[in-house]
C-alpha cells in the first residue's frame, strides 16, 4: 500500500477509534498488475522476495517514487504492461514511522512468510521505544 493510503487510513480510523485501541496492519506483499489494452487489469499477489524475483527476471529497474513512498517498476512482456509497487524495507520503515507517530497500540503484518529475514530487523529498529 502507498504511504498516502496508510496515512489516510490511520487518520480515518483514529477519527472513530481511540489510538490506544487501534492496531494498524501493514502488508508484506504487493500486487503485480497486468494491463492489456481493452481488458480489465489483472493483479497477482507476491511476497517481498517473489516480487523482487519478478522484477529481476524481467530486467526492470525499480525507481523510488516519492509520491507513494515505494519503489516502482514497469515492464512489457507478451503484449502486456506489468506494473508493480514494491513492499520492502525502505517503504515499510516509512509506514512504521507513520504508525509510531500516531501512537496506536501497535502494528500487525500480513502475510507472515511473505517477508524477508532482514525485514524483522527493520521492524525491531522502528518499534524500539514505542
Report the location of each language-model feature:
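Soluble non-cytosolic domains of exported or imported proteins
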Residues: 1-7, 86-93, 114
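Short intrinsically disordered, low-complexity coil segments enriched in acidic
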Residues: 1-21, 62-64, 71
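Generic structural signal for well-ordered alpha-helices
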Residues: 3-14, 96, 120-127
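Glycan-binding loop/region signatures in secreted carbohydrate-active enzymes
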Residues: 21-98, 125-130
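C-terminal functional modules
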Residues: 96, 110-112
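Acidic-and-aromatic substrate-binding clefts and catalytic sites of carbohydrate-active enzymes
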Residues: 112-118
Amino acid at each position: 500500500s502507498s504511504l498516502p493510503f496508510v496515512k489516510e487510513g490511520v487518520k480515518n480510523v483514529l477519527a472513530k477509534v481511540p489510538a490506544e485501541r487501534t492496531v494498524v496492519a501493514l502488508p508484506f506483499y504487493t500486487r503485480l498488475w497486468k494491463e492489456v489494452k481493452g481488458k480489465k487489469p489483472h493483479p497477482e499477489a507476491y511476497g517481498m522476495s517473489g516480487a523482487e524475483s519478478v522484477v529481476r527476471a524481467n530486467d526492470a529497474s525499480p525507481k523510488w517514487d516519492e509520491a507513494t513512498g515505494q519503489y516502482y517498476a514497469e515492464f512489457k512482456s507478451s503484449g502486456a504492461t506489468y506494473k508493480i509497487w514494491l513492499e520492502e524495507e525502505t517503504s515499510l520503515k516509512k509506514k512504521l514511522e507513520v504508525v509510531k507517530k500516531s501512537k496506536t497500540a501497535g502494528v500487525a503484518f500480513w502475510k507472515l512468510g511473505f517477508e524477508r529475514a532482514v525485514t524483522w530487523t527493520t521492524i525491531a529498529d522502528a518499534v524500539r521505544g514505542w
